[in-house]
């Protein structure tokens, strides 16, 4: 082909842009290069065609990439438990904050897998995510329960969350999950109040009362109550009251006034012992299948992180309102008698925790590493709190105590 020659005749080149509402069909020869006005007209036609093409193609691409992402989750809680309500609250917050781009559906315990099978189901992708507590994974790796039912070293649940976010806890949890091949992305949230010692046939007056007692608990508290002499059975929440009703348990603990009332504890016991060190600083866990989580857009991951912290605050406020109301109704309507756990029992719990921690740390290097991290944070944080936060008992007695005649 000679220099300067082209394969086609310029005058025969056609511009065809396939747009649903326009088809431009013009020859370059229709716009003589010597006519300035016609040249401008030609450029305007070309420009308009390009803009129109972009206006159509961009929405088509967006449509191909958009559409809500649906996730099927399960909680470890019965549908009637306030804990499942918290799970639904969390899902709604994420769904709303993503503008519906992520739609999480949360099923109650047992819908797909048993409560204690949540970790495996999420890790394998049978479920996209779940709502539960780390203590329910105790059988997979006992150090996981240090976020749920360990000694906490004087910290409350909010301090555990502070340690988790700012004291290295999140990194240690990721390390733990990696050690057992857990394909999960975990978020902790929702500080729980100190849990009762439990529900019994008669008040607990000394540690020896646990000797031979058939008792329900979970996580590291299994080791604690076993050391106290109890015959421990780790049952999920929905199975506790039926077991007590059939005489398979002499006593049990679950969590709080609202959950315990909704699950039917007052129907099988009228004695509840308040305060204990077996679960004084528990939190909830939000779990995503990591493969699915990693595939989410960065913006959506940021929303999930923010929604988790927002849900954590809201849950703690709802708990104060609901638990206090149910605490009153347990006494007035259900005729439950509440007793404070004797200090001697609490002291024995602390002594046994020291022994359990020492033994577990010797057996499990990761357990030892987590305990060291928690203790270092607690020594500083708890001292600050104890030195600065006033004991409110004086104010409560002043404003609401019995008035002199």
Short names for language-model regions:
Residues 1-41, 53:
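N-terminal secretory signal peptides
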Residues 29, 34-160, 178-405:
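N-terminal secretory/targeting leader peptides
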Residues 158-172:
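A gly/proline- and charged-residue-enriched helix-loop-helix capping module
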């Amino acid at each position: 082909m000679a220099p300067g020659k082209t394969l086609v005749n310029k005058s025969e080149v056609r511009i065809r842009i396939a747009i649903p509402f326009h088809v431009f069909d013009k020859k370059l020869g229709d716009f003589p290069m010597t006519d300035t006005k016609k040249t401008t007209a030609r450029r305007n036609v070309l420009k308009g065609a390009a803009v129109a093409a972009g206006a159509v193609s961009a929405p088509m691409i967006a449509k191909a990439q958009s559409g809500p992402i649906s996730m099927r989750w399960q909680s470890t809680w019965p549908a009637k438990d306030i804990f499942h309500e918290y799970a639904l609250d969390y899902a709604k917050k994420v769904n709303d904050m993503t503008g519906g781009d992520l739609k999480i559906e949360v099923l109650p315990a047992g819908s797909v897998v048993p409560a204690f099978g949540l970790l495996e189901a999420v890790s394998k992708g049978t479920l996209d995510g779940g709502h539960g507590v780390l203590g329910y994974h105790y059988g997979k790796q006992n150090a996981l329960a240090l976020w749920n039912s360990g000694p906490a070293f004087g910290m409350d649940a909010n301090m555990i969350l502070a340690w988790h976010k700012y004291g290295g806890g999140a990194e240690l949890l990721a390390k733990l999950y990696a050690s057992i091949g857990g394909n999960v992305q975990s978020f902790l949230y929702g500080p729980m109040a100190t849990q009762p010692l439990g529900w019994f046939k008669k008040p607990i007056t000394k540690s020896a009362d646990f000797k031979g007692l058939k008792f329900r608990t979970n996580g590291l508290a299994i080791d604690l109550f076993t050391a106290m002499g109890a015959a421990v059975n780790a049952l999920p929440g929905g199975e506790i009251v039926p077991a007590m009703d059939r005489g398979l348990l002499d006593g049990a603990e679950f969590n709080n006034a609202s959950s315990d009332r909704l699950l039917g504890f007052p129907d099988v016991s009228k004695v509840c012992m308040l305060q204990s060190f077996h679960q004084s600083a528990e939190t909830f866990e939000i779990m995503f299948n990591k493969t699915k989580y990693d595939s989410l857009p960065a913006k959506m991951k940021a929303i999930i992180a923010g929604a988790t912290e927002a849900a954590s605050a809201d849950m703690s406020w709802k708990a104060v309102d609901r638990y206090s109301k149910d605490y009153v109704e347990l006494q007035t309507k259900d005729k439950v008698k509440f007793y404070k756990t004797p200090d001697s029992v609490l002291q024995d719990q602390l002594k046994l925790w020291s022994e359990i921690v020492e033994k577990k740390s010797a057996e499990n290097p990761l357990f030892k590493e987590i305990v060291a991290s928690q203790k270092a944070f607690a020594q500083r944080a708890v001292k600050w709190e104890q030195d600065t936060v006033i004991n409110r008992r004086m104010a409560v007695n002043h404003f609401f105590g019995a008035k002199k005649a």
